[in-house]
Every structure is written in structure tokens, then in C-alpha cells.
Amino acid sequence: MKSRMPASRLMPILHRLLGVVALLALLPLARAATTDLGAPGGSLRGQLLIAAPEMDDPRFVHAVILMVQHDQGGALGIIINRPVGEVTYADLLKAIGTTGSPVPGKLRIFAGGPVELNAGFVLHSTEYHRPETQQIDGKVAMTASPDVLRDIAEAKGPKKSLVAFGYAGWGPGQLESELMRHDWFTADEDPALVFDDDRGLVWKDAMNRRSQAL
């Protein structure tokens, strides 16, 4: 795993969040991803994708990915076990250009994948809802708005959350090919894993829960 990103590098990324968070609105999450893809189990939306122990791509060694999109047009997921740094809640409010009453403490930032490294994604528990909120599978949601970051900084946000920059993406048929090569296992999504405070054990725990050896 790469070394933690220093705050001096995190802050410029957070400053760009307002401009790039709109990327989420381009994701076709509103349409049902239920098409038979010709891969075992069909769509993996709402599932965990777990790197096989033999994974030789350094970007995905021991990666656990929450799949938020998977249909005939391709696939998109967020790596949930790559923490890269922390930012104080006060600095978070500054980064998104707002004022408020931040609580003490820091927010961990994750590397969500190697694509669009400046794109911000907020995964969170489902009791929190805004007009922009999209349900992934009824257990985890995603909100495309800096307002969720403000609410998190002021302890008014979701009970559980994960803020990541970047994502893992596959073109049409690409993920299916990797599945047939046995590069990945799958497991049912579990908020206890997605929001686990002990990131170092997520891959091992996910492997213990794997439901399908592809």
C-alpha cells in the first residue's frame, strides 16, 4: 500500500471537490442494473469485489471494491480499504468553501481507485438522505453533494461514511473477462465491512465471507 498522503496534498484535492463531485450525476445509477451480463450472477451492483490472493496488478493487490455500477456498458466501483490520509473537519469546511461549526477530530480520506483521481465519492449509511442521494443496494447510499461533507464536519451527517477520491472502472466486457480469469471473488455487501474502522482487516474479512469463486 502506498504511504499516506500528506495534508499538503490532500487540501488541493479537497478544494477541487466542488468542481468534480458533479461527476457522480453522470453515473447512470438511476437505471436498474439488472441485465444478464453473461457472467455468473449477472450484475454485481451492490456486491463486494475482492482481489484474489494471486492478483498481480499493484493497483488492486488486496483491494476490496464496492460495486456501484455494473451493466452492459461497463462497471464502476470504489475501493474501500485504501486510506491515504486525514483532514481536520475545520479544514474540510474551508476546502469546500463554507463556514460552520466543525466538531473536533479528523476525517479519513481514501483512494477509491486509479481513475479520475480528483473525483470525490461519499459512501454512507442509508438513514441520511438528501435530494442527490442515490441508494446503491438498500444498505449503502452515495450522495453527490458537498453538503454531505459539511454535515459530516458538523456531526449532522450520516452515522457512517467513507470519502474517497478516484474509482475503479471497467469497459464493456472487461470485468467479465477478469472474472473468468479468476482475478476476483465476490461477497455480499455488508456495511460492517464498508465502514469498518480497522481497514487493515477488511480484505481478510471479505475473503472469509466470499460467496463465489469465479
List each language-model region with its residue ranges.
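A short aromatic-anchored loop/beta-hairpin motif
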Residues: R31-L214
